[in-house]
Swiss-Prot record:
A Gene Ontology term for the protein's cellular component: extracellular region
Protein location: Secreted
Superkingdom of the organism of origin: Eukaryota
Tissue localization of expression: Expressed by the liver.
High-level lineage: Eukaryota, Metazoa, Chordata, Craniata, Vertebrata
Molecular function terms from GO: carbohydrate binding; phospholipase A2 inhibitor activity
Protein name: Phospholipase A2 inhibitor
Organism in which the protein naturally occurs: Bothrops jararacussu (Jararacussu)
Amino acid sequence: MRLILLSGLLLLGIFLANGDEVDPDRKLLNSLIDALMHLQREFANLKGSFLIVHKARSFGSGSERMYVTNKEIKNFEALRQICEQADGHIPSPQLENQNKAFANVLERHGKEAYLVVGDSANFTNWAAGEPNKAAGACVKADTHGSWHSASCDDNLLVVCEFYFML
């Protein structure tokens, strides 16, 4: 009996003495778990911050779409490429408040910009005498948000539209 007790104590002593030693794979796994938990917290914080900014921008403009310029002046094809590379779109206001948000950007910069008008558009804001096919195949908005026919070769303010499905 004493032999069993001594053997048990000896094993316990060895276990306690080596208790700080951790299997390297287990140590790596624990490190990865900690890193993943940290990334999850950071992602949640980033998502929360993004939603706050998006809601504030939407509240200020009355639109779920954001219209952003890089202040460059380009033709229609260059605009299309720039917006596509930025994961955005050429502006296509579908509602009056969206057109107003777009026009606010143009007014701030004192420039005109391209937009796209769909064939089935429920909302339009053509200026008097427009559309005028003779002026060009593209459409531009002035600083008041009125739409005009334009040449696709005109160099206008680069504005891209971003919208989010939340």
